[in-house]
Amino acid sequence: MIVVKTGGRVLKQNLDRVVQSIIKTNNKIIYVHGGGDQVTELSSKLGIEPKFVTSPEGIRSRYTTKEELEVFIMVMSSISRNILSRVSSYRNSIALTGADGKLVLAERKKKIIVIDERGRKRIIDGGYTGKIKNINKELLVTFSNLFEVIILSPLAYDPDESTLLNVDGDQMAFALATALRSDNLILLTDVEGVMVDNKVVNKLTVEEAKELSKKIGPGMNRKILMAAEAIENGVKKVIISSGLVEDPIKNALEGKGTVIE
């Protein structure tokens, strides 16, 4: 069982090849997709102004209001069903959210610290974004025994507030891979791997990943920090690779990109 995650940007640019790659691989797959760009597009069409916030660490992320959560749910459902319809003729597949069967439980972020337009720290309401707290491993194993491909949208359930929450797709992929102690966790991105001085870093140990995370930009630094933590918690290998090539999953499994182990 491998876990594969692609962001919305990769899906916009290379959806057909990603789908074919899922079909062609011999591995059972848990496939987590993003779709942030698509959410922004639909929100704008509906007259809902997308809102983004910047953390003190310099990470820019979506701020999910109640209105935009509804858009997020619509877009994620559309993406997952589109992929399901293409894959199902070839592989036994199912499309889920993390909320289905309480597969992924999360806690709503009550307050978050952001940097405002004047560069000052502010504390604001957390909106409808969540932090993953628990994976129902027993249910996940049951699904993986029944289906070759599990397509998962990054939505989780908050049992305390009885609501769906937008969760970070990378965080969901890492949580799932860690729960299953997966052999491979593949992050398909719009770059070839971890870049240093315009060159791909081919291999990183856990310690090297932690050290490098201090020197590269926000976004990728979070990926390699989470990768290091996943390896320490039982995942055998994390591969950060391009999702824009002919056969992205095969390409990653062949070691193209950055391998952390």
From Swiss-Prot:
It is an enzyme of class 2 (transferase). It is found in: Cytoplasm. Belongs to the acetylglutamate kinase family. LysZ subfamily. Keywords: Amino-acid biosynthesis, Arginine biosynthesis, ATP-binding, Cytoplasm, Kinase, Lysine biosynthesis, Nucleotide-binding, Transferase. Its EC number is 2.7.2.17, 2.7.2.19. It catalyses: [amino-group carrier protein]-C-terminal-N-(1,4-dicarboxybutan-1-yl)-L-glutamine + ATP = [amino-group carrier protein]-C-terminal-N-(1-carboxy-5-phosphooxy-5-oxopentan-1-yl)-L-glutamine + ADP; [amino-group carrier protein]-C-terminal-gamma-(L-glutamyl)-L-glutamate + ATP = [amino-group carrier protein]-C-terminal-gamma-(5-phospho-L-glutamyl)-L-glutamate + ADP. It comes from the Archaea. Its main location: cytoplasm. Pathway: Amino-acid biosynthesis; L-lysine biosynthesis via AAA pathway; L-lysine from L-alpha-aminoadipate (Thermus route): step 2/5; Amino-acid biosynthesis; L-arginine biosynthesis. The record marks 5, 223 as: Transition state stabilizer. One of its GO terms (cellular component) is cytoplasm. Substrate binds at residues 35-36, 62, 166. This is [LysW]-aminoadipate/[LysW]-glutamate kinase. Gene3D superfamilies: Acetylglutamate kinase-like. One of its GO terms (biological process) is arginine biosynthetic process via ornithine. Pfam families: AA_kinase. Involved in both the arginine and lysine biosynthetic pathways. Phosphorylates the LysW-bound precursors glutamate (for arginine biosynthesis), respectively alpha-aminoadipate (for lysine biosynthesis). One of its GO terms (molecular function) is N2-acetyl-L-aminoadipate kinase activity. SUPFAM superfamilies: Carbamate kinase-like. PANTHER family: N-ACETYLGLUTAMATE SYNTHASE, N-ACETYLGLUTAMATE SYNTHASE, MITOCHONDRIAL.
